């Protein structure tokens, strides 16, 4: 019987689950509600295990065919131990060792990583990264996160804080406070939240009218509204879009001279803004970046969407067991 990989992408509302074959092709996917009633994490992880059992029982496989289980979690993860510290979206208290809890149910390998890292791994293997060994994924959503793949593996650093790219200091005036407690992080000026921050900061200085004036006054402005107005020629929104693009280009430049990726993959809701954002990023990136570091590097849009996390969770087993150890 062919071997399979089990994958879980744990979110604050739902958990996406899936079964993949040993070539990282998805065989099935489904979701369950995220149970946040248990602050130890045990109940949620048991629910995930039970759901895996139910779906395997309906298939042609048995649990003995499972090569391993990959799990993506929204919070800081110690990759070596499987510990998650501060998963506030799941209401877990203190440190939860996801690997140890799951190993109470199974005897196969269990790999755990941060959700942004696994999304990057998903794009590397099955998305816009085209299987390249050096890929950086940047997620532009309510916040800004991402992951760095170098020489085929996720960059974790000595304590799991490697590639926390949302906290690069780019706003040296430190105008906006970040959720991390510090000010000036790129997340405060180049995420969907950051777009609104910039609108509210610059609007009082406006010398011309804007089509989003009423949205600003009603405190209902959004990144989408800004980008849509920019496409329609609103000069204020074009200015904001260019500022955001410049910050993202600066981030891309930093990662280029640091890890020299083949692909810089832009994902998340803001990446769908279209050419008005992406082309501005590319232009400024080429102006900023050390020439050898940008040669043959492509800035591309993510392809997997909401499936990046579950694909990357399975990718943990594919990368660290099948590819690295040659196990099939």
Swiss-Prot record:
**GO MF term set:** ATP binding; glucokinase activity
Q: What is the lineage of its organism?
A: Bacteria, Bacillati, Bacillota, Bacilli, Bacillales
Which family, according to UniProt? Belongs to the ROK (NagC/XylR) family.
Subcellular location, record wording: Cytoplasm
The reaction(s) annotated as catalysed by this protein in its Swiss-Prot or TrEMBL entry are: D-glucose + ATP = D-glucose 6-phosphate + ADP + H(+)
What top-tier enzyme class does this entry carry? transferase
Q: Which GO terms describe its cellular component?
A: cytoplasm
- NCBIfam families, alphabetically? ROK_glcA_fam
Look up the EC number in the record and give it.
Answer: 2.7.1.2
The answer, when asked if Lyase is one of the entry's keywords, is no
Q: Does the keyword Metal-binding apply?
A: no
Q: Where in the chain are disulfide-linked cysteines found?
A: none
Know the name of this protein? Glucokinase
Where does it primarily localize? cytoplasm
The record, for SUPFAM superfamilies, names: Actin-like ATPase domain
According to its UniProt entry, the protein's GO biological process terms are:
glycolytic process
Specify the species. Answer: Staphylococcus xylosus
Q: Which UniProt keywords apply?
A: ATP-binding, Cytoplasm, Glycolysis, Kinase, Nucleotide-binding, Transferase
């Amino acid at each position: 019987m062919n071997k399979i990989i089990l994958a879980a992408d744990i979110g604050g509302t739902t958990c996406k689950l899936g079964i993949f074959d040993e070539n990282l092709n998805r065989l099935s996917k489904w979701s369950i509600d995220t149970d946040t009633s248990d602050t130890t994490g045990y109940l949620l992880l048991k629910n995930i295990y039970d759901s895996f059992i139910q779906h395997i029982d309906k298939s042609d496989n048995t649990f003995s065919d499972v090569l391993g289980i990959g799990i993506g979690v929204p919070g800081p993860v110690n990759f070596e131990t499987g510990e998650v510290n501060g998963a506030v979206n799941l209401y877990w208290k203190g440190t939860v060792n996801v690997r140890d809890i799951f190993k109470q149910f199974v005897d196969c390998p269990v790999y755990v990583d941060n959700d942004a890292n696994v999304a990057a791994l998903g794009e590397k293997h099955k998305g816009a990264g085209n299987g390249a060994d050096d890929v950086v994924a940047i997620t532009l959503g309510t916040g800004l996160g991402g992951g760095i793949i170098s020489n085929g593996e996720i960059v974790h650093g000595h304590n799991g804080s490697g590639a926390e790219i949302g906290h690069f200091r780019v706003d040296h005036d430190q105008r906006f406070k970040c959720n991390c407690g510090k000010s000036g992080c790129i997340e405060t000026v180049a995420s969907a939240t950051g777009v609104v921050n910039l609108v509210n900061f610059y609007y009082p200085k406006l010398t011309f009218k804007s089509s989003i004036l009423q949205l600003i006054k009603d405190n209902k402005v959004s990144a989408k509204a800004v980008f849509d107005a920019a496409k329609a020629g609103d000069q204020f929104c074009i200015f904001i879009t260019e500022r955001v693009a410049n910050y993202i280009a600066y981030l891309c430049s930093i990662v280029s001279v640091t890890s020299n990726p083949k692909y810089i993959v832009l994902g998340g809701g803001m990446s769908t803004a279209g050419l008005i954002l992406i082309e501005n990023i590319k232009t400024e990136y080429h102006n900023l970046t050390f020439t050898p570091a940008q040669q043959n590097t492509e800035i591309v849009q993510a392809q997997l969407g909401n499936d990046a996390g579950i694909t990357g969770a399975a990718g943990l087993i594919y990368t660290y067991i099948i590819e690295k150890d040659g196990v099939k």
